[in-house]
């Protein structure tokens, strides 16, 4: 009798087990879909934030670039005057510092949102921030050189101003390269429809 009961109940039990299995698999698939959607939304927010940061950094560079070009020209005039033996007195040879941010990029990396970005976008943005890091290191070195220049200006003003001209010149060259990378990357992202 128990075998007969088992035979009758077996299809019901198998159907119930299949429905439970299907329900569990459906729930897991729905959870995976939701998590994937959340990750993609995070990556999209991170990308928009990074693009806004790059735009802001570009504006900062545009401002400081003009000022540093003017300062470089003024420093070259001062150097020419000093080399010609004319006293320039208290010549103002200075440097405008660009305050660039990488907070959005660092946040995108720490939140692991970059894992869900298109590989080419991630590579392009990595290049932007790599060059920005180089620029910031060169800028810090230029600030150090300018500080040293002020310290040694009384002993050898020609050498001090020459060092200032070199520092500003190197920074200005790298400045142009960084702006070009910013613009190219932004243009590419907009053209491909990744951002507005």
Where do the language-model regions lie?
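N-terminal alpha-helical signal peptides/signal-anchor transmembrane segments
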Residues: 50-76
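N-terminal positive-inside, membrane-proximal cytosolic segments immediately preceding the first
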Residues: 1-21, 29, 33-35
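Soluble extracytoplasmic domains of inner/organellar membrane proteins
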Residues: 82-83, 89-196
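Surface positions of alpha-helical coiled-coils, especially the charged/polar e/g heptad sites
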Residues: 39, 46, 50, 57, ...
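Transmembrane signal-anchor/signal-peptide helices with a preference for the extracytoplasmic
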Residues: 24-46
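Conserved non-transmembrane functional hotspots
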Residues: 66, 77-80, 84-88
